[in-house]
Amino acid sequence: MKTIIWPTYINSEHSRGEGRKLSLEESVEEPKIREISQSLKKLKIQYVVEHNKSYPGSWWEKSGRVVVEQEDMTKLELLRAIAKNIKNSRNN
């Protein structure tokens, strides 16, 4: 199953109405596509980065997205794992 991960989903700078899926405590300030892909690499999950894509809620910004091929976790579990890995890597 393919899952789309937009940086907005885990961005603490965005509101729920703007597309954030995680709580403020779980989310990350301004996550980058590079950080998301590094996190997925650590989790050993296959992914494809698409740099020229825009989140529909902010179509004027080319934020990029990551297409993930996985079936082990729900989308929310995956987002939490990605955000946690990014937080851990920023603290080191």
Curated annotation (Swiss-Prot):
InterPro entries linked: Signal_recog_particle_SRP19, SRP19-like_sf, SRP19_arc-type
One Pfam family of this chain: SRP19
Chief location: cytoplasm
Gene3D superfamilies named in the record: Signal recognition particle, SRP19-like subunit
Localization of this protein: Cytoplasm
GO biological process, one term: SRP-dependent cotranslational protein targeting to membrane, signal sequence recognition
Keyword Ribonucleoprotein: yes
One annotated Gene Ontology cellular component of this protein: signal recognition particle
Signal sequence region: none
Keywords linked to the UniProt accession: Cytoplasm, Ribonucleoprotein, RNA-binding, Signal recognition particle
HAMAP family for this protein: SRP19 (MF_00305)
PANTHER family: SIGNAL RECOGNITION PARTICLE 19 KD PROTEIN, SIGNAL RECOGNITION PARTICLE 19 KDA PROTEIN
Protein role: Involved in targeting and insertion of nascent membrane proteins into the cytoplasmic membrane. Binds directly to 7S RNA and mediates binding of the 54 kDa subunit of the SRP.
Family: Belongs to the SRP19 family.
UniProt subunit comment: Part of the signal recognition particle protein translocation system, which is composed of SRP and FtsY. Archaeal SRP consists of a 7S RNA molecule of 300 nucleotides and two protein subunits: SRP54 and SRP19.
Record-given protein name: Signal recognition particle 19 kDa protein
Gene expressing this chain: srp19
